[in-house]
UniProtKB/Swiss-Prot annotation:
Entry's localization field: Cytoplasm
Organism encoding this protein: Syntrophotalea carbinolica (strain DSM 2380 / NBRC 103641 / GraBd1)
Its biological purpose: ATPase subunit of a proteasome-like degradation complex; this subunit has chaperone activity. The binding of ATP and its subsequent hydrolysis by HslU are essential for unfolding of protein substrates subsequently hydrolyzed by HslV. HslU recognizes the N-terminal part of its protein substrates and unfolds these before they are guided to HslV for hydrolysis.
BP GO annotations: protein unfolding; proteolysis involved in protein catabolic process
UniProt-recorded name of the protein: ATP-dependent protease ATPase subunit HslU
SUPFAM superfamilies, per database record: P-loop containing nucleoside triphosphate hydrolases
Keywords, sorted A to Z: ATP-binding, Chaperone, Cytoplasm, Nucleotide-binding, Stress response
Taxonomic lineage: Bacteria, Pseudomonadati, Thermodesulfobacteriota, Desulfuromonadia, Desulfuromonadales
């Protein structure tokens, strides 16, 4: 679990996301509280429940991006799900408990990689010995350098080890037994009907038959990596991995539920949306704290942090059932983005859009340079299009940039090794249709 301070978390988010200070502070405090809870005495730790967050704001203002960056910072099991993918129990679709199972699957991969790193040195030593066993038979007859004064097997093995460590044998080929690619099993049973029982039929039937292997001639450099992986797999205790993964999910897991407004009912509407409230009622016990059965054992959700987000264009947060509203005590409103924010988005972040397009064109030998006036004009046109049509926030910049560089991107391979300056006149010329046309529907994503 990360021990970044709230200020450090906000500072890290600032490198990628412009504005939305309130939302950044809320998730930073929530993440820090996860670490604080781990430092509390055992008898009180179980009593401290996470304060779930709901982020409210129009599309394209940074809700999902905050979640993505939070996942990388958290160093904890983190999964993003869309509420609209789930259906009430009894309907066709995924049941809500699958989000916890998916989180556990992710945690197992995370812990397994951590444990594999711990045994990497031992795995490398064992892999080296196996590689020497593969190289040694007939080595003297094939390589005159290995004969002579060190004709004994021990001497040959040591000499071979030195050559192997130097990389002198990397291009030599050895015969190695590797797992053969198998045809995927046909799904007779859909996972939706069986996952709540913790049964994976594909895995169950797959384990009934031995895995097929085949012998392949591969380079020593490639064989070394395969053998290290095989040895690490043998050294890692999967029982321990499963136990640690369950514990980490229970104590520091984070679930980000996007599009939560899509399951909000509107004044008791009936018809095709009748199952929306059912999905909310199914999500409720998981957010409140319950035990979910998985194939690795039961997982308690009492201390999993839930972060929900929605645009709430049509529905309102108050349209969610009261019990679910009460489980998200921290509400954060994200503000719409204007011209100044668009200018900053284009220039300030580490992965700024302008830098991305410059890097793409650089691969064709074309060096792009945007003047400040040109970037401000792009921001102004994006704001204008958003105000006259659907406001899709920062995503509008992708549309504008693609239109702006469409001609240049098409002709780039024929005009290598050039420097191109994008000035305000070029922007106005390329985007004149958008700036002039009142009916902008053909430019809407």
């Amino acid at each position: 679990m990360t021990n970044f301070t709230p200020r450090e978390i906000v500072s890290e988010l600032d490198r990628y996301i412009i504005g939305q200070k309130q939302a950044k502070r809320a998730v930073a405090v929530a993440l820090r509280n996860r670490w604080r809870r781990q430092q509390v005495a055992d008898e009180l730790r179980d009593e401290i429940a996470p304060k779930n967050i709901i982020m409210i704001g129009p599309t394209g203002v940074g809700k999902t991006e905050i979640a993505r960056r939070l996942a990388r910072l958290a160093q904890a099991p983190f999964i993003k799900v869309e509420a609209s993918k789930f259906t009430e129990v009894g309907y066709v679709g995924r049941d809500v408990e699958s989000m916890v199972r998916d989180l556990l699957d992710l945690a197992i991969i995370m812990i397994r990689e951590e444990e594999a790193r711990k045994v990497r040195v031992k795995a490398e030593d064992l892999a080296e010995e196996r590689l020497l066993d593969l190289l040694l038979p007939g080595a003297q007859s094939r390589d005159p350098d290995l004969s002579g004064e060190e004709a004994g097997e021990g001497g040959t093995r040591d000499k071979l080890r030195k050559l192997l460590r130097k990389g002198a044998l990397d291009e030599r080929k050895v015969e190695l037994e590797v797992q053969a690619a198998q045809m995927p099993m046909m799904e007779v049973f859909t996972p939706q009907g069986t996952e709540e029982m913790g049964i994976n039929f594909k895995e169950m039937f797959g384990n009934l038959f031995p895995k097929k292997t085949k012998r392949r001639q591969i380079k020593v450099s490639e064989a070394r990596e395969i053998l290290i992986e095989q040895e690490a797999e043998r050294l890692v205790d999967m029982e321990k991995v499963n136990t640690l993964a369950r514990e980490r999910v229970e104590q520091s897991g984070i679930i980000f539920i996007d599009e939560i407004d899509k399951i909000a009912g509107q004044n008791g509407r009936q018809g095709p949306d009748v199952s929306r409230e059912g999905v909310q009622r199914d999500i409720l016990p998981i957010v409140e704290g319950s035990t979910v059965s998985t194939k690795y054992g039961p997982v308690k959700t009492d201390h999993i942090l839930f972060v929900a987000a929605g645009a709430f264009h049509v529905a309102k947060p108050s349209d969610l059932i009261p019990e679910l509203q009460g489980r998200f005590p921290i509400r954060v409103e994200l503000t719409s983005l204007g011209e100044e924010e668009f200018f900053r988005i284009l220039t300030e972040p580490k992965n700024a859009l302008i830098r991305q397009y410059e890097a793409l064109m650089e691969t064709e030998g074309i060096r792009l340079h945007f003047t400040e006036e040109a970037i401000r004009e792009i921001a102004r046109i994006a704001t204008q299009v958003n105000s006259q049509t659907e406001n899709i926030g920062a995503r509008r910049l992708h549309t504008i940039m693609e239109k702006l560089l469409e001609e240049l991107s098409f002709e780039a391979p024929e005009h290598r090794e050039q420097s191109v300056e994008i000035d305000v006149d070029y922007v106005r010329k390329q985007l004149s249709d958008i700036a002039r046309d009142e009916d902008l529907s053909r430019y809407i994503l």
